[in-house]
Amino acid sequence: MTISDKIRIYELSRDLNLENKDILDAAQKLSISVKSHSSSISVEEAKKIKNLINKKNSDKQILSINKPSNKKDNYKQNKEDKSPVISSVKGKPLKDNSNKKQLLNKPLNKPESLKVIPNQLKNPNKPNIYNSSQSQANLTNQNTKSKPSEHFNKDKKTFRNNTIPPIKTPAKPPIQLIAKPKNINNNLKSNESSKNIPNSGDKRELSLKPDQNRNKPKPKNSNNRRNTPELVGAPIRRDDPNKQNNKQNITFKQTVSNRPGTPNRPGTPNRPGMPNRPGLRNKPTDQGRPGSFNRQANPNRAGAPNRPGMPNRPGLRNKPTDQGRPGSFNRQANPNRAGAPNRPGMPNRPGSRFNSQKSTGIRKPVSPNELLQLQKTNKSEKDTLAKTNNQKQNIESPKQKAKAPASRPNAVPSSKKPPHRPFSNSSKKPGRKDWDDSAKLEALRNKNPQKQRQKVHIIGENDDSLTSETSGYSGEKISILSASLARPKKEKSEESKSHKSTKQFKKKKKETTRQRQKRRAMELKAAKEAKQVRPEMIIVPEDNLTVQELADKLSLESSEIIKSLFFKGITATVTQSLDLATIETVAEEFGVPVLQDDIQEAAEKTVDMIESDDFDSLIKRPPVITVMGHVDHGKTSLLDSIRESRVASGEAGGITQHIGAYQVEFKHESKKKKLTFLDTPGHEAFTAMRARGTKVTDVAVLVVAADDGCRPQTLEAISHARAAKVPIVVAINKIDKEGASPERVKQELSEKDLIAEDWGGDTVMVPVSAIKKQNIDKLLEMILLVSEVEDLQANPDRSAKGTVIEAHLDKAKGPVATLLVQNGTLKSGDVLAAGSVLGKIRAMVDEHGNRIKEAGPSFPVEALGFSEVPTAGDEFEVYPDEKTARAIVGDRATDARATKLAQQMASRRVTLSSLSTQANDGELKELNLILKADVQGSVEAILGSLEQLPKNEVQVRVLLSAPGEITETDIDLAAASGSVIIGFNTSLASGAKRAADANDVDIREYEVIYKLLEDIQLAMEGLLEPDLVEESLGKAEVRATFAVGKGAIAGCYIQTGKLQRNCSLRVIRSDKVIFEGNLDSLKRSKDDVKEVNTGFECGVGCDKFSSWTEGDIIEAFKFVTKKRTLTQ
């Protein structure tokens, strides 16, 4: 003690012979503020702690379970000891707030004290397991006139007793609540094998109703081993030594649910309503056990509860029902007792008999999840309980469906497998509802086999001692059990089937790392094998591909593409985008031609012009022939030869950069046949125009020069014709020229799967000369033969459908479109929709300029009357009224605007390389253009060529591109945006020139596409910053030095070139540059001069260098600017 009458925690623990943590725990429970073992408390607080610890020690003595002794006077019930009744509570069942599951690792050698708390339910830890042989003698001397009571020992907490009258109606039985201490392990420290329970005044008796207490028996205490609940190691069986006719006394651990939805906990004492224990045959049941209600087993007692889910325990035959068990309420087992509560979820134990009624068999322990499901079904399926009970009786037959009792968690594994308990069929008790849910439990388990968890057997540390105390309880006498009790073999096979069914629900094992690596290696190997075959042609979408995409299209590894680019001086990664020129260069290296995706789509025929209604009125129509080939191979000359011989003289045949549509007549087999020819440009910029020509054609004439062979546009034309699925007729031109080799052309075409007929193929090849007009008639005959095979037909009696071949804006006529009628007849005044353009035919002229009123199938005409210039390649169709056509045009215009916006955004596309350039130079340079051309095809050709220009450092941005003349509106747009106006084969509107001069707008006009593209490239290069290049001026040798003031002058002799004042110089000594700077002073004979030429002497001075030495070499140079190019 200290001076201030304070006590330290460690002093108090030393006085009480306890540890510091026990004192700290007690202080915490008493709300005494202490921090550590060195904290001080007052004397009053120390007394409180002592009282609490003494109370705990007394509780521990009460809680310790003694081994029952053979004395008869161990327990004497005091008649005056009356305990309040814990009865069922009206209303909803109380919930258990305790979520902890407790497990006893040590045997309980003393009876447990149960703490009774109203409105709260404590789950038991472990059911009591009795030795039936030791307890049978104790059940014979009970006084039947004594009051029934159940003895509860004190817990470490005080008891609160709440007596509530029982419920009269047993329809929904409420729950009897018996709480137990939270931590029994903390209270069990003694392992004594035989102690008597003190018969003190601290004992509490829990009785039933007062009127029943007077008539119920009081247990005797002489030699009653049933008075002490005892835990044994395992649910094993042994013979009863006092009854020779009983060959199986089986202890059984039954899991009992206290309330709906609450999991059962092991280690609880027997409570009111607990089933009679197995193995007590021929025992009188009129003797109550300590701490239990003694109820007589009168099945006709009014109002007795039938507890659902509690199967009767086996082996309780011929047992009087006036005796209870120790540790439980001794009550009369009268099922018809009025007002007795019926507790849901409490199954009757199997094997017990009421009025010689058979039990329903042993059931497996119920898991909490299964119990919840059972209670839900009990609430929702009251009308099917009888049917469920019948199923249960059928399932649990004694011969086929025997079930083994579940092992207790702390069970010690025995050396021999105990035989299994037989089942006996039982009928429903009279006057009681069938609350048994065994069938439902079996159905749930069969329905959800994957939810069955393997039971874990936990071996307690004192299980060995418990087994030894039972004197060989588990081992030696099992062999004398009847062999009929063993589980049938059929059940084992069914169990194995059920195990197999549960395995089917298991998920597949995850793929291991080794398996995944092996699978990936096989996939890579298969991909490499697939990539060994090179494609004939690759299609490039939107003019760009990444390196990885290009490698996939070429069936190569990406490393091969990167290596190829590296040798060309281009550093690229697999995700970097490549422009069309680079793609073509790489593809050409691997021998694969390149075709743009939009061009491929443009060549495909999208609309079938003949409908099902036209089949009755079809007639033959003239074929449409498209002349295709490489530039300068003689396409236009060939067509001119055909037209000059078939068309009236004097017709102008200006075939330049447009599609020319012409119709000629040819006499074949004494009949005049009409042929419609479309001439397409051969320049590479007009790919889209060639594709449109192929789209509407019936026969493709491929012109190949005999002296030049197959060229890139030749291969492109072949791909277009194949995309359109039209037959190809090859005209080998220029056979009259020196060096012509038609056989070489046939060889090259055969490599492209175009094999001549004389070589065994099916491709018609005609050698012709357009200049000398050789074999022209033969070519036309072959075209007619091929077209007849195609069986070309159309219906002239319907409204017209066709394709826009070309369109342009005429200064006098307005929008003009060249239309090719493919089905029906086009008439003046028809309302048509061409793409997103509405038109009403005001006039039509043929290729000769003659006005016509109607045009039949395969007839090309120029039509006037469109609201704006239609897009070349769009299909047109005539509609009955303007309202219908306008509605269709409105929908198409919305889509056209979205497409145009996407194209404008694409024109400003910035690649990875251009972004790096922008980061280095500080700003991305742009060249703004406004493009106006004569026809739509020229606009498309120019835009396609601009896309192929290098855009790494300068981005070309086309603000406006349209056919027609240059207007003042275009000038205003150019002035606002700083753009250059490009005009191709067009003119300026009135006032446009004056507006351009006023706003200082640059207008460039061109007639040839080569010059236009060249000037645009020069303009882009002009935006680049020039490079500084070093230019050498001359050399001089230092022959003398002169000291002037603080510096020095070098006397030099000019060897080559000249020296200029303020130029840059480099001083070299012993082949090493020792100084580089500016030439500040240059003198000759003491006079300052601007330059000194070869062979003269001069004096050279530098402000920053004065250590001249004879023999030094001075190199003079200057920096000049050099224009950069886009290719660098």
UniProtKB/Swiss-Prot annotation:
Main location: cytoplasm
Protein family (similarity comment): Belongs to the TRAFAC class translation factor GTPase superfamily. Classic translation factor GTPase family. IF-2 subfamily.
Biased composition range(s): Basic and acidic residues: 70-83, 147-158, 201-214, 432-445
Binding residues annotated for GTP, in chain numbering: 629-636, 679-683, 733-736
Record-level Gene Ontology MF annotations: GTP binding; GTPase activity; translation initiation factor activity
Region called G3, residue ranges: 679-682
Chain residue ranges for the region called G4: 733-736
Biased composition (Polar residues): 120-146, 243-267, 386-397
Region entry G2, spans: 654-658
Protein name: Translation initiation factor IF-2
Subcellular location: Cytoplasm
Location of region: G5: 769-771
Region G1: start-end pairs: 629-636
